[in-house]
UniProtKB/Swiss-Prot annotation:
InterPro entries: AB_hydrolase_3 (IPR013094), AB_hydrolase_fold (IPR029058), HSL_N (IPR010468), Lipase_GDXG_HIS_AS (IPR002168), Lipase_GDXG_put_SER_AS (IPR033140)
Entry's EC annotation: 3.1.1.79, 3.1.1.23
Post-translational modification: Phosphorylation by AMPK reduces its translocation towards the lipid droplets.
UniProt entry keywords in alphabetical sequence: Cell membrane, Cholesterol metabolism, Cytoplasm, Hydrolase, Lipid degradation, Lipid droplet, Lipid metabolism, Membrane, Phosphoprotein, Steroid metabolism, Sterol metabolism
Recorded GO MF terms: all-trans-retinyl-palmitate hydrolase, all-trans-retinol forming activity; diacylglycerol lipase activity; monoacylglycerol lipase activity; protein kinase binding; retinyl-palmitate esterase activity; rRNA primary transcript binding; serine hydrolase activity; sterol ester esterase activity
Modified-residue entries (Phosphothreonine), positions: T574
Organism from which the protein derives: Mus musculus
Assembly notes: Monomer and homodimer. Interacts with CAVIN1 in the adipocyte cytoplasm. Interacts with PLIN5.
Main location: membrane
Modified residues (Phosphoserine): S557, S559, S597, S618, S650, S651
Protein name: Hormone-sensitive lipase
Length: 759
């Protein structure tokens, strides 16, 4: 169904439903249903012309006719998904609204949530339209003055995001992946609730399991808490959360479900300089020095994975480099050594430059080792913010050169070498190749970079707008990772009283807090179920109950019990009962209930949860909801909105997001998209695999276009309906398996020697 037909069908159904519920009397539920359909009609009619314009020019930004992908197309596709869901829901309501089994409260909650999402998508479409008018033809990233980019960011971070993390979570992705995203979001908000209080690791995870029940049954609360976390918690929180997969119990479970390999060994490469021959003249050599930046010389860790035990992999030299990881279970009898492979894959993992290791990526790397039949050498580089740029690049380059020189120890002859990585690892694959060319040593025979980030500048692009709704790559989290990697992140110190507790004091404190959380979690579950059933829970007399009262006003969802109340008795969950005026207007409500709920949802005040989003006083926060002050001499982005349209504003009070104007983010070894032509011409064939709904999509499209313009061999494959990081979700569903298989095909293409020319 084309966009215009879909919009017209939705408008017709909305008008029919609006007329029906308007005639149902003065009841609160009927009034809200009528209002929400009026809002759907208004937003759909306002959005359709803008989407049509974006779609009409989107082909100018594609790599070629065979690869129709860029941020403008992705925004239109996302808006169509939202419109399609509203169309489906409107049809359902029209067909079942007279039935005694019609769940008015459930359908109202979904309609209000998706109307809020549609309103925000309309704002994003206007942003994209503004970019379209100020960018050069064919350019996706804004290249103008930094003031306008800062104004974009200032306007952008004030938009409300919670609607995308509640009932609408992951609506743009394939349905098979949405349950995982919901589980991830519940785990995130539960983990964030205990972060900075239980600092000793596993207790945070354990407490989250017992106290996160209310987030599972209350999508609105989950969305509000998700928004608070992504805007206020620092990069150390994200390191801790993303590294949950490093916990031995979880990693063991993941390995049980993955392919069994003969070799999976962690190696420690000594920080000793060695010589490498120059490709221009092998008789000459260049010295490869160990990494020195920030922390001085230190061993570099890497993991060797091989499906078969090959010659050299159990040599005395390699055994001396092996690092103990505890006893490992040998599931199959020790085989005879297979001959060395003719190829080698050097892998660099992702994780935003701040988290994860090869252990997190081991499940899919084992599958690669089996399918490709070659050894895989995965580098564990030092992570930011403790080791900012260029430490990771130095370590990856050092480890790559070591692997090329000592490939016989890794079970390979090194005839063909592929550099492969995802996300931040894809960035490092490209920059390692640039550095190898600069040193004059052997570059890999090809690069496979999955959804890489190719520019770390704070530049607006249509695909970056998707970070407003992306549960894996929110804009503020991207900024925190960039800040950490570039070395501009403020140092975060533990509280002095925590240091004074000592190890035993921390254990005693965490045990006490864990038992308290267990009791409060059980009480929270009971209260939630009692509220959902229409019963009023008894008041607790526990002194610790005071600590959970600020969230009580957010806890109640739109439920049948709440909607069954007589008109005028709105209860305390006004946040869940937003009318269409509330959903489409950023002006503060005059309702005391709304004022109270907005106050309840305000940001946390402790300084230890503020990263680089500077604190502001309450008056500034209130003004920011209605007014975003422009910089001097800079056009206002708000002018992109037509008169009468007001997107929803965030209640979190975020007033600032740093603009990375430091020259370091323009370094070509940090942002290869900004590298001069002479450097990019030294790259080997590059194979990019991107996601159509990834905020990093435009990075891949523009990088491929630059290489294509230079005559460099490059391919770009864009997979549909999958989020950033699909390699780590390879076993989740058919779509992720197919996307992962395509990455394997690209690696296999690189490792295949070119056909000999015919005489």
């Amino acid at each position: 169904m084309d966009l215009r037909t879909m919009t017209q069908s939705l408008v017709t159904l909305a008008e029919d439903n609006m007329a029906f519920f308007s005639s149902q009397g003065p009841g609160e539920t009927a009034r809200r249903l009528s209002n929400v359909f009026a809002g759907v009609r208004e937003q759909a009619l306002g959005l359709e012309p803008t989407l049509g314009q974006l779609l009409g020019v989107a082909h100018h930004f594609d790599l070629d006719t065979e690869t129709p992908a860029n941020g403008y197309r992705s925004l239109v596709h996302t808006a169509r998904c939202c419109l399609a869901h509203l169309l489906h829901k409107s049809r359902y309501v029209a067909s079942n609204r007279k039935s005694i089994f019609f769940r008015a409260s459930h359908n109202l909650a979904e309609l209000e949530a998706y109307l809020a999402a549609l309103t925000q998508l309309r704002a994003m479409a206007y942003y994209a339209q503004r970019l379209l008018t100020i960018n050069r033809p064919g350019v996706l990233f804004f290249e103008g003055d930094e003031g306008l980019t800062a104004d974009f960011l200032q306007e952008y971070v004030t938009l409300h995001k919670g609607c995308f993390y509640g009932r609408c979570l992951g609506f743009q992705f394939t349905p098979a992946i949405r349950p995982f995203l919901q589980t991830l979001s519940i785990g995130l908000v539960s983990f964030g609730e205990h972060y900075k209080r239980n600092e000793t690791g596993l207790s945070v995870t354990a407490s989250s399991l017992f106290t996160g029940g209310r987030f599972a049954i209350d999508p609105e609360l989950r969305g509000a808490e998700f928004e608070r976390i992504i805007q206020n918690l620092d990069v150390h929180f994200w390191k801790a959360f993303w590294n949950i997969t490093e916990i031995e119990v979880l990693s063991s479970l993941a390995n049980m479900a993955s392919t069994t390999v003969r070799v999976s060994r962690l190696l420690s490469l000594p920080p000793e300089a060695f010589e490498m021959p120059l490709t221009s003249d092998p008789r000459l050599t260049v010295t490869i020095s160990p990494p020195l930046a920030h922390t001085g010389p230190a061993p570099v860790l890497a993991r060797l994975i091989s499906y078969d035990l090959r010659e050299g992999q159990d040599s005395k030299v390699l055994n001396s480099l092996a690092k103990s990881e505890g006893p490992r279970l040998e599931l199959r009898p020790r085989p005879h050594q297979a001959p060395r492979s003719r190829a080698l894959v050097v892998h660099i993992h992702g994780g935003g430059f701040v988290a994860q290791t090869s252990k997190s990526h081991e499940p899919y790397l084992k599958n690669w080792a089996q399918e490709l039949g070659v050894p895989i050498f995965s580098i564990d580089y030092s992570l930011a913010p403790e080791a900012p740029f260029p430490r990771a690049l130095e370590e990856c380059f050092f480890a790559y050169c070591w692997a090329v020189k000592h490939c016989d120890l890794l079970g390979s002859t090194g005839e063909r070498i592929c550099l492969a990585g995802d996300s931040a690892g894809g960035n490092l694959c490209i920059t390692v190749s640039l550095r190898a060319a600069a040193y004059g040593v052997r570059v890999p025979d090809g690069i496979m970079a999955a959804y890489p980030v190719t520019t770390l500048q704070s530049s607006a692009s249509p695909s970056r707008l998707l970070s407003l709704m992306d549960p894996l790559l929110p804009l503020s989290v991207l900024s925190k990772c960039v800040s950490a990697y570039s070395g501009t992140e403020a140092e975060d110190h533990f509280d002095s009283d925590q240091k004074a507790l000592g190890v035993m004091g921390l254990v005693q404190r965490d045990t006490s807090l864990f038992l308290r959380d267990l009791r409060l979690g059980a009480s929270s579950w009971l209260n939630s179920f009692l509220e959902l059933s229409g019963r009023k829970p008894q008041k607790t007399t526990s002194p610790t109950a005071e600590s959970v009262r600020p969230t009580e006003s957010m806890r109640r969802s739109v439920s049948e019990a709440a909607l069954a109340q007589p008109e005028g008795l709105l209860g305390t969950d006004t946040l869940k009962k937003l009318t269409i005026k509330d959903l489409s207007n950023s002006e503060p409500s005059d309702s005391p209930e709304m004022s109270q709920s907005m106050e309840t949802l305000g940001p946390s005040t402790p300084s230890d949860v503020n990263f680089f989003l500077r604190p502001g006083n309450s008056q500034e926060e209130a003004e920011a909801k209605d007014e975003v002050r422009p910089m001097d001499g800079v056009p206002r982005v708000r002018a992109a909105f037509p008169e009468g349209f007001h997107p929803r504003r965030s209640s979190q009070g975020v007033l600032h997001m740093p603009l990375y104007t430091s020259p370091i983010v323009k370094n070509p070894f940090m942002s290869p998209l900004l590298a001069p032509d002479s450097m990019l011409k030294t790259l080997p064939p590059v194979h990019l695999v991107a996601c159509a709904l990834d905020p990093m999509l435009d990075d891949s499209v523009m990088f491929a276009r630059r290489l294509r313009d230079l005559g460099q061999p490059v391919t770009l494959k864009v997979v549909e309906d999958l989020p950033h990081g699909f390699l780590s979700l390879a076993a989740l569903c058919r779509e992720t398996r197919q996307a992962t298989e395509f990455c394997v095909q690209r690696i296999r293409l690189i490792l295949t020697p070119p056909a000999a020319p015919l005489n």
